[in-house]
Amino acid sequence: MKLTVTLPTHSYDLTIETGALDKIGTWVRSLWQPQRVAIITDETVNKLYGAAVEKELQAAGFETSLIAVAAGEQSKSLETAQLLYDFLAEQQLTRSDGLIALGGGVVGDLAGFVASTYMRGIHFLQVPTTLLAQVDSSIGGKTAVNTKKAKNLVGTFAQPDGVLIDPNTLKTLEPRRVREGIAEIVKSAAIADVELWHRLSSLENEQDLVAHAEEIITACCKIKRDVVEEDELDLGLRLILNFGHTIGHALENTAGYGVIAHGEGVSLGMIQITQVAEQQGLSPLGTTQELVTMLEKFHLPVTTDRWSEERLYQAITHDKKTRGGQIKIIVLEKIGQAKIVSLPTEEIRAFLNREGGI
């Protein structure tokens, strides 16, 4: 399956194909003429796919270099970015060369950020190997690193030249990482595709979803593609993709990056904000329970004891969606349809402190 992301200044294809990683050299050659390619990956993915990917690229005539960062959210930092800048400079990569992000969401965000800022921008490709990255973070051009203050606080918009998605990589993914991706899939269905929601309802568990991965990934990529085409720079409609993310990011930040996985934070965030939305009359009664039922089926968390009102308030008010004393909150009008509401930041405390918090 091939989907095209069509934007005013740059368009590119999403290639979704089981076994596609085995033909990565041919794919890259169809997109690029540069002879030198740097691969950024993490230590876990490198052990699984690094050598094979380099071999395929070299067979296609590319000169390759590879660097593997530590696996995990802690690598998504300015300090790691500096190490990567130094590596690219040592390899004498220029703006006529290219970079490949091979890995999950952390690698994709980090490598995309580095590619967009090294020498004021070099060409790059996304090759996501986790379910979360395949259905969400590899598409749309958002790149970022974290700081101590907030997740994704420093970043750019930079579109790749292409995205290669091979569902076979899910076979080597540990169950917790599969569930992370499922949280983003549930989010996508909840905000924009009731038919996908019904399809997810028909699946028995995580294993059943992975067995239908190409179908599910394609559906999510279509949602992301359509939203990004309408709002590339996150000024309006694209904000709906952040459903559950404001509180989710805050939970990740306050717990310490890596303690609560991104998908787990999103799961908790969707429940929390929907409980609030029901109380405010913004979402129909029973919507929270529909989410709980779906998320629990896939063994995603819906409650947590990691709830510090003050630290969460500080993290939320540093969120990128806070502008002019207002924060944009995404709520469900119904399953399959989201809307954006503005909330004064001073009201966040009342939300966090309400009776029955998560």
From Swiss-Prot:
Keywords: Amino-acid biosynthesis, Aromatic amino acid biosynthesis, Cobalt, Cytoplasm, Lyase, Metal-binding, NAD, Nucleotide-binding, Zinc. Zn(2+) binds at residues 184, 245, 262. Its cofactor is NAD(+); Co(2+); Zn(2+). GO terms for cellular component: cytoplasm. It comes from the Bacteria. Pathway: Metabolic intermediate biosynthesis; chorismate biosynthesis; chorismate from D-erythrose 4-phosphate and phosphoenolpyruvate: step 2/7. Catalyzes the conversion of 3-deoxy-D-arabino-heptulosonate 7-phosphate (DAHP) to dehydroquinate (DHQ). PANTHER family: 3-DEHYDROQUINATE SYNTHASE, 3-DEHYDROQUINATE SYNTHASE, CHLOROPLASTIC. This is 3-dehydroquinate synthase. It comes from Enterococcus faecalis (strain ATCC 47077 / OG1RF).
